[in-house]
């Protein structure tokens, strides 16, 4: 006589492969409701969410009683049979045969009511368990994978620039300073560009990707004190070559997210149509042409002034995909930008402006 086979440990994203079989799941209780003789447990494990149905007659009495009082976010392990159900997320649910409470959680502070950002940031370690934050972080992870895969596949070498630096790259007014032993101040990096440029002279094509810090006090969606930035650098790449690389890179990353993150984009309420239009070639206009476009729309900018967020929004609204603005005046760009030999008052550089008012990429 053979002993019954033990339930197979699996994850929620793989349940559709186990319809009709006994499985074991470990996760956290996202929600719970009861109709007296049946508990409906919404369980998540990081890969997805599934409804687990527990009937009084199918499980030991103590397990059924324990489930009746489980607080949200309690951790548990359950075993049961996977059943096909087209109405359920993922097309399956689990009929529970046994339940083990690993840990009973404290009362969960994030309730269905509206909470302020300050409250949610104070509980950030719990907030990331929510459906929306979960989707944001999954999309972010896919963007990072897509970016590094693209550059690795095009012969770029990743180099890691220091986070503590001796000098400013983007101006001294936005530096975070710290004492560096008895050697004077050091600064949190604003950019790895200067290190990248040195590395490009050794390897030809390089990129760095890491945290960046700007001591900007403005509280807008365009200003962050800390963010992660990817910076490629290539030797012997002219302005047209740079723009061709940038548009192919951006289109590739957006296409990858559309391919692999449809579920997350739906969870975020993101209309995919504007993303589907992000395809090369991107429009290219000069700084002078940008000023004329702005003037036609009632925004007059003096020649030589940099373009701000409002101007970038107006320009990007004129196109249905990212747009390059190239050949800015030298006086409004960084010292390391190369002057145009045919017109030394402008530089051989370009900004890529995203549609929908997001501004410079």
PLM feature spans:
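A translation/RNA-centric and nucleic-acid-associated enzymatic feature enriched
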Residues: 170, 174-252, 270, 277-361
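Acidic/polar loop patches that form or flank catalytic/metal-binding clefts of enzymes
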Residues: 159, 258-259, 300-303
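Class II aminoacyl-tRNA synthetase-like tRNA-binding/catalytic domains
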Residues: 2-235
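Cytochrome P450 heme-thiolate monooxygenase catalytic core
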Residues: 158-160, 265-266, 325
């Amino acid at each position: 006589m053979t002993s019954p086979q033990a339930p197979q440990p699996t994850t929620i994203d793989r349940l559709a492969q186990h319809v009709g079989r006994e499985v074991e799941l470990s996760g956290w209780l996202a929600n719970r409701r009861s109709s007296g003789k049946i508990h409906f447990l919404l369980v998540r494990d990081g890969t997805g969410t599934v409804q687990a149905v527990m009937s009084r007659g199918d499980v030991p009495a103590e397990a059924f009683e324990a489930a009746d009082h489980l607080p949200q976010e309690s951790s548990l392990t359950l075993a049961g049979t996977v059943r096909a159900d087209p109405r359920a997320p993922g097309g399956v649910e689990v009929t529970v045969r046994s339940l083990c409470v690993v840990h009973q959680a404290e009362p969960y502070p994030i309730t269905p009511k509206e909470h302020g950002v300050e409250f949610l940031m104070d509980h950030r370690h719990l907030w990331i368990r929510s459906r929306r934050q979960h989707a944001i972080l999954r999309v972010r992870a896919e963007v990072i994978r897509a970016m590094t895969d693209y550059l690795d596949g095009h012969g770029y070498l990743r180099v890691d620039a220091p986070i503590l630096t001796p000098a400013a790259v983007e101006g001294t007014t936005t530096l975070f300073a710290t004492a560096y032993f008895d050697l004077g101040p050091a600064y949190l990096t604003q950019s790895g560009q200067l290190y990248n440029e040195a590395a490009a002279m050794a390897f030809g094509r390089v990129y760095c990707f890491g945290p960046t810090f700007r001591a900007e006090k403005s509280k807008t969606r365009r200003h962050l004190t800390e963010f992660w930035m990817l910076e490629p650098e290539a030797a012997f790449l002219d302005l047209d070559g740079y723009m061709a690389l940038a548009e192919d890179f951006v289109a590739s990353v957006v296409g990858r997210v559309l391919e692999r993150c449809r579920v997350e984009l739906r969870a975020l309420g993101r209309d995919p149509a504007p993303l589907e239009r992000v395809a090369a070639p991107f429009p290219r206009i000069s700084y002078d042409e940008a000023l004329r476009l702005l003037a036609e729309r009632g925004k007059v900018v003096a020649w030589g002034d940099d373009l701000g967020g409002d101007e970038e929004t107006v320009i990007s609204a004129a196109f249905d995909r990212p747009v390059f603005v190239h050949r800015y005046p030298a006086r409004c760009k960084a010292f390391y930008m190369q002057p145009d030999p045919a017109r030394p008052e402008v530089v051989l550089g370009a900004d890529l402006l995203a549609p929908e008012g997001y501004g410079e990429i």
